[in-house]
Amino acid sequence: MRNVYLGYFLEAFVVAGLTEETCKFLFLRTTWRSPAFDFQFDAIVYAVMVALGFAAFENVKYVYSYGFATGLVRAVTAVPGHAIFGVFMGYFYGYAKLSDYWGREDDCRAYLALSVVVPVLMHGCYDFLAFAQESDGRFTLLFYAYLIALYVFGILRVNRSARADRRVSRETVFDYFRRMQYPVPPQYRDRNDDFWR
């Protein structure tokens, strides 16, 4: 029985958690130099979008392989789980961007590492409990308690991060439009620079 749980552990933390969260992080990393990434909370938005894109792709694969019922179960468990992992990835990614903005390279690297490590651990715990509850019913209650805790902490993290949002770029979107010589959208032409700061 111990070997079964070791297999679940390796599958959950290494195969699923590490691989999937690293892939999501690599996609997220493409936003680092985007002029649209000018506020800390943007990191959470980008990370959740990447996570939901991954979850949609994964769900299509599961529905195709195991049927529609599996897709329905995953829609209320795995898909929100990926979104919550994305929230925490984005939270630390946003702090990495803020640290970079302030010129704190060591903090930036540490937060970038945390933006992968924390979601890997969260994802690994989720998958381990999901695998274990399939073979031992005693894990079912623990799995759903963990799922509810993820939802609650994820929502709290989003709310707190939204309230504490800070600028992480010196260039505003308006500055970017001017630099790239893009036309300013008509509804914003009469706004002064203070509107964008």
Q: What feature does the model see in each segment?
A:
Residues 1-197:
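Hydrophobic alpha-helical segments at protein termini of multi-pass membrane proteins
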